[in-house]
Design a protein with these regions (language model features):
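Extracellular/periplasmic helix-loop-helix junction of adjacent transmembrane segments
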Residues: 55-83, 123
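Hydrophobic transmembrane architecture of multi-pass small-molecule transporters
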Residues: 17, 405-407, 422-528
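Helix-loop-helix hairpins in multi-pass membrane proteins, especially solute transporters
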Residues: 85-224
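12-transmembrane solute porter fold
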Residues: 32-47, 52-54, 67, 74, ...
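Cytosolic juxtamembrane N-terminal segment immediately preceding the first transmembrane helix
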Residues: 1-47, 61
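Interfacial helix-cap and linker-helix signal at transmembrane-aqueous boundaries
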Residues: 59-61, 91-92, 176-184, 240, ...
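Central cavity-lining transmembrane alpha-helices of secondary-active solute carriers
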Residues: 75-90, 139-143, 330-342
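Hydrophobic transmembrane-helix bundles of small-molecule transporters
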Residues: 166, 178-296
C-alpha cells in the first residue's frame, strides 16, 4: 500500500524504509522551512522535561512534596518513553508518523492545560507521562523534517543535528531557569512547555511531511508482546529512578517490582523468539556485532552522566546555586551546539566510528580534569571539562545510531524496530542506571570519607580541642565541614570511576572498529 504521489517520484526521492517519508528535491526556501520545523520538534521533545528536571527543588517546594515524591516526575517521563518506540515504528509503517504525532501531542497538550488549571502532584505526574509518550514521535519528527532540509549527499548530517541539538536543552534550561522562575514560579515552566507544544503542533499541520510507503505490519501477537515489555521496562525505570532515594534494600516494593519486571520481560522475549515475524529480531540482537553496538551505546550513555550527576552534584556540594552556575551552563550549551554542528559537518560512513571514539576520548579527558577538584573549585574551573562533555555528547549520539543503521540496511527493514527499540532502551535505561550507579557510589564513598575524616580528628590537637570546648554549635559546624569535604572527595572518586569506564569503553570501541575494518577488507578481497 502506498500513499498517492510515491509512484511519481524519482528513485532517489522515494522512502528509504516503509514508514519513512519520501525526500523530494525541494527548492531551498522549502528546505529551510522544513529545517526550522525539525529544529522546533527536536527541542520540544527535550525542553519540557529538561525544565522540570533542573527545577525539581522549586517544584517540590511549590507542590509541598518530599524529595522521593519529586523524583517521580522525571522517572515517570522515562517510564512511558522507554517503550514507546516499540509501538511507534510499526505504527508509522502502517498508518504514518503524522497521525501518531498528532495523537501524542494532543494528549500532551491536554495534560499541560489540565495541570495549569488544576495543579497538584497527580496532574504533574500525568503531564510527565504524556510528555514521555509524545517525546518518541517528536524525536522522529525532528529527524524526518531535518532530512527534508538536506540534499541526499548530506542527509547523515540531519541525523546528527536531530539527535545532537536536543541535548542542549538541559544546559539551556539551567541557564534560563533563574530568570524564568522570577517571572511566575513553576507555572512559567509549564507555560513554556505549552507554547512549545502548540507551536510544534501548528508547524506540522501547516507543513506536512511528504508521503510515505505504508505496509501491513501489525500482528495480534504484537499486542501481547508490547504490554508485557512496556510494563516490564516501566518497572525497571521505577526501580532505577527511585532505588537510591528509598534505598535499594529498605523499600519492599523494589524487590517485588524487579521480580515482576523480570517475569514480564522474559515472557515477552520467549514469545518473540518463537514468532515467525517477531516485533524484535532477537537472533540478530544476539550476534557479536549487535552486542558490540549495544555496549558502545550503553557505556557511552553511562559516562556522559559525569556532567548531569557528577559535575552538577559537585557544584551543589560546594554551595553553588543556579545563579552562580549560569555562565558555566552557557558555555556547556554553546559547546553542545558546536558539537552538533561539527558532527554534522564531518559525519560520513567512513568517520562515524572515529567520531564515537573521539567523543569517548573527550569524556575521559574531562573526567580526568574534574577528578582534581577541591573545595576551592568553582564554575570557571570547570568550563573546559564541561565544554568537552557537552561537545562530546552532541557528537556521539547520532553516529552511534548510524552504526546500527548500517547493519539494518544489510539485514532488511524488518529489523529496524529492533534497532530503534534497543538503542532507545540503551539510552534511557542507561541514563537511569548511570544515575543510580554514580549517586549510590558517591553516597557510599562519602560515608567512607566522612568516617575517615572524623577518625583523624585528634581531640588533643589545639584547633579540635577549641571547637569541642566551644559547645554544640561549634561541634555541629565541624561536622558540617567534614561532611562537605567528604562529599567533595566522593565526587572526585566518581570522576575517577567515570574515567575508568571511559577508558574501557574506548578500548571496546577500538576493538569494534578494528573488527569492522577487517570485515570490510575481507569482503573486498572476496569480491571478484
Amino acid at each position: 500500500m502506498t500513499d498517492s504521489g510515491i509512484a511519481s517520484l524519482q528513485p532517489h526521492e522515494r522512502p528509504l524504509l516503509p514508514g519513512s517519508p519520501a525526500t523530494p528535491d525541494f527548492p531551498h526556501p522549502v528546505r529551510f522551512a522544513y529545517g526550522c520545523v525539525g529544529v522546533l520538534a527536536a527541542f520540544t521533545s527535550a525542553m519540557g522535561t529538561a525544565l522540570i528536571s533542573v527545577n525539581l527543588s522549586n517544584i517540590q517546594g511549590t507542590l509541598g512534596l518530599d524529595p522521593t515524591q519529586a523524583s517521580w516526575l522525571p522517572t515517570v517521563y522515562l517510564m512511558t518513553y522507554v517503550s514507546m518506540n516499540l509501538i511507534l515504528v510499526k505504527f508509522r509503517q502502517q498508518y504514518g508518523l503524522r497521525l501518531f504525532a498528532q495523537l501524542g501531542l494532543g494528549i500532551y497538550l491536554a495534560a499541560v492545560v489540565a495541570h495549569l488549571l488544576v495543579g497538584g502532584f497527580p496532574s504533574a505526574l500525568f503531564v510527565r507521562a504524556a510528555s514521555g509518550a509524545a517525546a518518541a514521535p517528536l524525536t522522529s519528527l525532528g529527524v524526518f523534517y531535518l532530512l527534508q532540509a538536506f540534499p541526499a549527499q548530506r542527509r547523515l548530517s540531519a541525523f546528527v543535528l536531530a539527535f545532537g541539538l536536543p541535548l542542549a536543552a538541559t544546559p539551556l534550561a539551567r541557564l534560563f531557569s533563574p530568570d524564568l522562575l522570577e517571572l511566575g514560579q513553576f507555572r512559567t515552566l509549564y507555560l513554556i512547555e505549552l507554547g512549545l507544544v502548540l507551536a510544534t503542533l501548528a508547524a506540522i499541520l501547516a507543513l506536512r511531511l511528504p508521503p510515505t510507503e505504508r505496509v501491513q505490519v501489525f500482528e495480534w501477537a504484537d499486542f501481547v508482546t508490547y504490554p508485557l515489555m512496556a510494563v516490564g521496562l516501566a518497572l525497571l525505570c521505577a526501580v532505577l529512578g527511585q532505588g537510591r532515594l528509598e534505598w535499594w534494600f529498605d523499600a519492599p516494593w523494589i524487590g517485588v517490582a524487579l521480580a515482576v519486571a523480570a517475569v514480564l520481560i522474559i515472557a515477552a522475549l520467549v514469545l518473540e523468539w518463537n514468532r515467525t515475524t517477531p516485533l524484535l529480531d532477537l537472533r540478530w540482537a544476539l550476534t557479536p556485532d549487535f552486542i558490540g553496538f549495544v555496549l558502545i551505546a550503553t557505556l557511552t550513555r553511562v559516562i556522559l552522566s559525569e556532567q548531569t550527576v557528577g559535575a552538577a552534584g559537585f557544584l551543589t556540594a560546594v554551595g553553588m546555586g543556579q545563579e552562580q552556575t549560569q555562565r558555566l551552563y552557557a558555555v556547556v550549551a554553546a559547546a553542545t551546539l558546536a558539537g552538533a554542528i561539527v558532527g554534522a559537518l564531518t559525519v560520513s560512513q567512513q568517520t562515524i566510528l572515529f567520531q564515537v571514539m573521539a567523543a569517548i576520548a573527550l569524556i575521559a579527558v574531562a573526567a580526568f580534569l574534574d577528578s582534581h577538584a577541591d573545595n576551592l573549585t568553582r564554575p570557571p574551573q570547570l568550563y573546559a571539562s564541561q565544554a568537552m562533555l557537552g561537545f562530546a555528547s552532541a557528537m556521539f549520539l547520532a553516529p552511534t545510531l548510524l552504526i546500527g543503521f548500517s547493519q539494518v540496511l544489510a539485514r532488511g527493514w524488518r529489523s529496524f524496530t529492533t534497532l530503534i527499540v534497543t538503542f532507545g532502551v540503551s539510552q534511557n535505561l542507561g541514563a537511569l542506571f548511570s544515575q543510580a550507579l554514580l549517586q549510590t557510589f558517591q553516597y557510599d564513598r562519602a560515608r567512607f570519607h566522612y568516617a575517615h575524616l572524623i577518625g583523624q580528628l585528634d581531640p588533643t590537637l589545639p584547633y579540635v580541642a577549641e571547637r569541642l570546648k566551644a559547645g554544640p554549635a561549634a561541634v555541629a559546624t565541624l561536622a558540617a565541614q567534614a561532611t562537605r569535604e567528604a562529599n567533595i572527595l566522593a565526587y572526585n572518586d566518581v570522576f575517577v570511576l567515570v574515567l575508568v569506564i571511559a577508558v574501557l569503553t574506548l578500548i571496546n570501541t577500538a576493538i569494534f572498529t578494528l573488527r569492522a575494518i577487517a570485515k570490510i577488507k575481507a569482503a573486498q578481497r572476496a569480491a571478484p
